[in-house]
């Protein structure tokens, strides 16, 4: 179990594919009927709710006027029509359906614009659309069309109001106004498809299953107000025989998921086999196994995922293989005459950028996993995979100064293409102290982990060189921000104290030099020890310091208290939540599954510092949550479980039209930062804010 937590954590750190999965009904089918307006808030009576705007080298504000119109106040129209693109997500177009689409528009100047209902991805082609001229008089646009293509459950309404064909060549600042959007299915007779909603369960558990000796808990839920009561049965799926039964316990309302819950505890049952839970009127669970090898497949897939993400080399795989990619030299931002070979490393998340900050976290998580359970990775070549990333990171360090470039990427995210088809110029974005400190920490750890290999010496030298740069370079008060016109991931940070602390802790643990220890003691452990994320890394530093040969003095005691306090804080969340997840109600944010995996790792590390059975059990609970014991009913790792995401935000998966297995997706985001999620989940409880859509 421990090895799996570390592996999933590493995957979540670098490769959280921020799919937003749908929390939906149980086995319902419905045929689409004639509808009222499919565009929510099409009259802007609720302000900008459900509406958003994409900018690409254009500049504009999206407002709602006192008259209830959407105003796009254009400052710079950009170089092309989609430089400014207001849009709406959250409707479906069914094959064979006849639709009527209309809206009103006027502008403060004479110009043209493009309107489209389009595919939200791939080649972004339009199902229906057109170019129209507009001026100060309000114009009514209306079109009736038949959806000829396969049903699209997540298209996008777009308005391209940048510099398009027919616009004045000297077009400058102005406003264009929209109102009264209406999309109706006026004739459903041609629709032959039956629309099936995702099948979820009211009995949720780890969909892979359990080790025979493990604690085994399923959560039974109900949206009704009455408390849950009754009994449950464990049923052998081969024989349909009841092999274990018990009473539902701990009935209560769970605030984060907004539902009544109770637990079915079948921990005493340990016979290997394939089973499901039946809970009377509440329904039954998905199938699961009890076996000694249930995690072997997912561990292998999670580790292989890193191989499939390799950049700069031929990757062999029937579905996701590709030739060499991104092999050209990268120019330095602001100094294009200078270039470096930065070939290698892993592609990040859904795009093909390579970023030092999350790379350091992912590499260190894998090294921690290996260090804590070497035998588990004997057949996985895990050190070779880690080395592939570390050797790329070495190329990101400037030889003369020891400073480290923050990232290498193209200026913009690519379309839905395989990595070899991203042909834009590679650019090394400016050095950052956060990236340099993370680099120093990773290299110092690598020097220790690879101590029996010749690579150890170069990792050691790189770590020390990076720290020398940091000693000469105080934090600039701002941190890294994307250069102008760059839209790829920023991985920014408003301070670097935790990164420096982590670097010092790793340097001290690896080399034992007292100078690192003295510098480390200048920091406040309470302020430093906040998280194991890519932005807040202080808990890594505290753990490495506490597990070093440092004297057990007053600073050590303070650091230990701070570290365990954070673990105990998360432990309280586990005790309060029906699903035993370590998140508070308000921590279901962008990438929440990374938080769950981070906390699982924190529990294991805390157990190393202060052994406690509760830490180990809590760590196992986080795995159960990620693999299906949650209110969405999803196993959040692609390719595993009965219900898992099929539409992750991951370009190779989008090209292949199937999810790459072994990815941990981002999970619920109660802030609804994805427009499609916002349009469909506006009333969903915190823990249910997940929809499986790119």
Please provide the spans of the model-predicted regions.
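Low-complexity, Pro/Ser/Thr- and charge-rich linker/hinge segments at domain boundaries
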Residues: 188-204, 213, 285-320
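Short Trp-Ser/Thr-centered turn/loop motifs at beta-strand boundaries
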Residues: 88, 129, 282-288
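Bacterial Sec-dependent N-terminal signal peptides
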Residues: 1-25
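Short coil/linker segments at helix-helix boundaries
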Residues: 368-388, 421-427, 445-459
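Aromatic (Trp/Tyr) and acidic
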Residues: 207-281, 304, 308-364, 368-369, ...
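Carboxylate/His-rich catalytic cores and anion/metal-binding grooves
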Residues: 380-403
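Structural beta-strand segments of beta-rich domains
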Residues: 99, 201, 214-218
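Extracellular and organelle-lumenal recognition/adhesion modules and their flexible linkers in secreted
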Residues: 22-192
């Amino acid at each position: 179990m421990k090895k799996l937590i570390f592996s999933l954590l590493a995957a979540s750190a670098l490769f959280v594919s921020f799919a937003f999965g749908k929390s939906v009904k149980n086995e319902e089918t419905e045929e689409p009927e004639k509808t009222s307006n499919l565009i929510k808030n099409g009259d802007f009576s609720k302000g900008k709710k459900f509406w958003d705007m994409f900018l690409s080298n254009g500049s504009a504000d999206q407002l709602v006027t006192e008259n209830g119109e959407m105003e796009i106040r254009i400052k710079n129209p950009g170089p092309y029509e989609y430089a400014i693109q207001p849009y709406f997500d959250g409707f479906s177009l069914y094959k064979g359906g006849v639709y009527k689409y209309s809206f009103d528009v006027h502008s403060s100047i004479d110009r043209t614009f493009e309107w489209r209902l389009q595919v939200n991805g791939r080649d972004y082609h339009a199902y229906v659309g057109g170019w129209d001229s507009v001026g100060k008089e309000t114009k009514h646009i209306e079109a009736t069309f038949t959806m000829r293509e396969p049903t699209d459950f997540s298209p996008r309404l777009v308005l391209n109001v940048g510099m398009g064909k027919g616009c004045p060549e000297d077009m400058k600042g102005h406003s264009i106004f929209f109102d009264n959007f209406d999309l109706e299915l006026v004739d459903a007779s041609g629709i032959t498809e039956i629309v099936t909603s995702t099948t979820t369960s009211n009995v949720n558990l780890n969909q892979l299953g359990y080790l025979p000796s493990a604690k085994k808990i399923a959560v039974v839920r109900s949206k009704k107000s009455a408390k849950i009561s009754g009994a449950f049965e464990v049923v052998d799926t081969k024989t349909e025989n009841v092999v274990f039964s018990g009473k539902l316990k701990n009935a209560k309302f769970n605030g984060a998921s907004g539902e009544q819950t109770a637990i079915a505890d079948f921990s005493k049952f340990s016979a290997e086999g394939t089973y499901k839970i039946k809970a009377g009127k509440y329904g039954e669970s998905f199938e699961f196994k009890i076996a000694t090898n249930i995690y072997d497949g997912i561990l292998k897939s999670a580790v292989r995922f890193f191989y499939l993400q390799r950049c700069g080399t031929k990757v062999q795989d029937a579905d996701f293989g590709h030739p060499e990619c991104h092999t050209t030299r990268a120019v330095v931002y602001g100094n294009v005459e200078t270039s470096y070979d930065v070939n290698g490393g892993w592609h990040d998340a859904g795009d093909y950028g390579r970023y030092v900050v999350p790379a350091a976290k992912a590499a260190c998580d894998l090294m921690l996993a290996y260090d804590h359970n070497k035998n588990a990775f004997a057949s996985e070549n895990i050190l070779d995979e880690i080395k592939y990333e570390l050797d790329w990171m070495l190329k990101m360090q400037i030889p003369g100064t020891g400073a480290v470039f923050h990232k290498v990427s193209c200026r913009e995210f690519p379309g839905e293409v395989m990595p070899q088809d991203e042909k834009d110029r590679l650019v090394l974005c400016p050095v950052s102290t956060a990236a340099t400190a993370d680099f120093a920490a990773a290299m110092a750890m690598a020097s220790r982990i690879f101590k029996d290999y010749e690579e150890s010496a170069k990792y050691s030298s790189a770590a020390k060189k990076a720290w020398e740069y940091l000693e000469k370079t105080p934090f600039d008060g701002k941190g890294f921000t994307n250069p102008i016109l760059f839209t790829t991931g920023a991985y920014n940070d408003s301070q670097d104290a935790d990164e420096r602390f982590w670097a010092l802790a790793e340097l001290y643990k690896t080399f034992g030099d007292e100078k690192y220890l003295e510098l480390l003691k200048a920091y406040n452990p309470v302020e430093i020890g906040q998280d194991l994320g890519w932005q807040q890394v202080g808990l890594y530093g505290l753990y490495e310091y506490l597990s070093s040969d440092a004297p057990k003095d007053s600073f050590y005691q303070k650091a230990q208290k701070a570290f365990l306090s954070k673990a105990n804080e998360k432990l309280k969340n586990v005790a309060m939540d029906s699903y035993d997840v370590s998140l508070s109600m308000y921590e279901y944010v962008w990438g929440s599954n990374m938080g769950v995996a981070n906390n699982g790792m924190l529990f294991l590390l805390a157990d190393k510092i202060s052994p406690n059975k509760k830490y180990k059990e809590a760590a196992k609970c986080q795995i159960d949550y990620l693999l299906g014991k949650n209110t969405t009913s999803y196993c959040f790792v692609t390719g595993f479980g009965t219900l898992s995401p099929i539409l992750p935000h991951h370009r190779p998966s989008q090209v292949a039209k199937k999810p790459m297995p072994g990815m941990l997706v981002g999970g619920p985001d109660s802030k609804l930062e994805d427009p499609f999620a916002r349009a469909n989940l506006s009333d969903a409880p915190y823990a249910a804010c997940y929809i499986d859509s790119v």
